[in-house]
């Protein structure tokens, strides 16, 4: 009997089902939103359990866990993708109830993934599964061991299974697939606009923040960008009140962004709010008193990542002193700079010592009014009340930085984070110190004397040009130097040269994609000096158009530190223009406000106006009582008093004042000083009817008047020469033509009437060249000008 066949039964093959788990499991498609959910779960786990061996200080309680998993389950059951902005709003709402910097940690991890600083890893540490913390020799075990076993998620929960599915799907993804996932994730983060989620509470802490400040990293970049724009191009920055609003939001949401207080201080300075600016600076340095420990061994031994920093004690007084200096509180600023010097010496900080000493020099020479003018006598008198020992100590400290500016590298402590930036800062300080010495010589009237100052400065500028100039320090100093150069050229009567330098600086300041048109104080000074040079050659129309352009570029409510130079320039130029037109009431209007912004210019013009209107005693008293500490200012005051006394026939007193002005001119470097003084000597002699002696004095100035004279000086010179020649019975017509060429276009109608008077006398029947027709034409022209511009010519007062 044949054997029976073995009966086989078809059963399910367990090996075929579970032998290849990665191939047979139903995976969860990996999308950017699910990666973000994975990162959020990891962030929440660290907040509950801790990181590695370091436990969490405040694990989640039952209510907090309920809130956490309500949000997580709501996210994983969503059928569609949501934007990154909406996801951040959800995390912010969760952070509102939980705290523990969940939003900050989540956004930081996401930004690192987006910028490639970290890789996308769909994994958890072992503690996520075991709920047990690893041992570490530096971390003490708790007395109650059960406190170290914090279960975050049940392994049988739907969320746990969902996580496993996502992890499995990502693990079996090919390399090209992971690249595509990373690329989509990066685009998901950086693309799209903010789409407000439908939540009943969208104000306060739950209010959706602008993308620029929705995390600490972006907030720092935004603060740095706005601070740069506020300093270099204020009109391109956001409105100041909007910046303050965003700063308040950053201060509430991102406590680690301490730079926001520095930005607020800069905004308060622009708003002329010195008290709040100082408060913001104090907050900035209070928040920066701690720094990350650089010694990792010390950090592991002490379990402290932060250590106290003494930088604020050294550099805090410098910034606060700058604020006080900007607002004219120079004695307070001087005391703060002295405190910074002491702190730098105690802490052996050579760089801080250099900066503080440089600020002491700037505090003594850099004014809030016109450049290259010394402080008035009243300020000096107040400064002399300080103790003599303090002044001597400060003078020694001042000389120490001047003796040390030739060092090639900083000797002790570095301020910047890398050597290149530190060397750049050092070279900037060296060049700035040399440049300040140059400015001191220019203000003292000895820059063009035979000394080494010019070579000293050129060495500093050459060293600065060798830098990469990462933070535009060299560019800022170069713009400052060009502005000072234009001021120095105008002070020496080199108006055409000043015009070329100012135009070059303005034309080169063009708009670029990464560098907008600069609107610094240096560029405002260059524009103002362009106006002065145009007015000096008689082009008032173009000067006025330039003033209008400057007022639009440097508005008072946005950039008041630059706008003050434009305001001073506008008042001075318009005063001069109206004075030549005999519009004295308009001149009085332009003097309003000039007394505080430019006291020397106010005194000179006020006295000129008083003298022209017959108030001799008041004019002389105003000039005599003003204590001037400026070299060129003293010379101008003596010349002004001399011309006033000459116009009123008080020749002996005028001669004394001319001699005093000559003493200053002889010892000063100003190239036009000799011209200005000697021309007034000629006017004095002409007033005494000493025509031959006046002609000899004035004739020696023929070359200088063409190089260093303004159109007013040239007109007075040529009409004086013409009168001298007429009184000497010689032909004055050449000088009369040259005088007419200077005042053509109704720039000085009163001088034109004086010119017509000379022509009438010259062509009179008893004159040198009798011509009845020319005489009548001169009289008719005189009558027309008198009808339009009545009043005498006050050239003797100038």
Swiss-Prot record:
InterPro entries per UniProt: Apc5 (IPR037679)
Disruption phenotype: Double RNAi-mediated knockdown and/or mutagenesis with gfi-3 results in increased embryonic lethality and the production of one-cell arrested embryos.
Effect the entry attributes to changing residue 693 to K: In av9gf; gain of function mutation
GO biological process, one term: protein K11-linked ubiquitination
The keyword Nucleotide-binding is assigned to this record: no
Keywords: Cell cycle, Cell division, Coiled coil, Developmental protein, Meiosis, Mitosis, Ubl conjugation pathway
One cellular component term from this protein's GO annotations in UniProt: anaphase-promoting complex
Function: Probable component of the anaphase promoting complex/cyclosome (APC/C), a cell cycle-regulated E3 ubiquitin ligase that controls progression through mitosis and the G1 phase of the cell cycle. The APC/C complex acts by mediating ubiquitination and subsequent degradation of target proteins. Required for the metaphase to anaphase transition in meiosis. Plays a role in the segregation of DNA and centrioles during meiosis in male germ cells.
Family affiliation: Belongs to the APC5 family.
The name this protein goes by in its record: Suppressor of spindle checkpoint defect 1
Species of origin: Caenorhabditis elegans
Gene it is expressed from: such-1
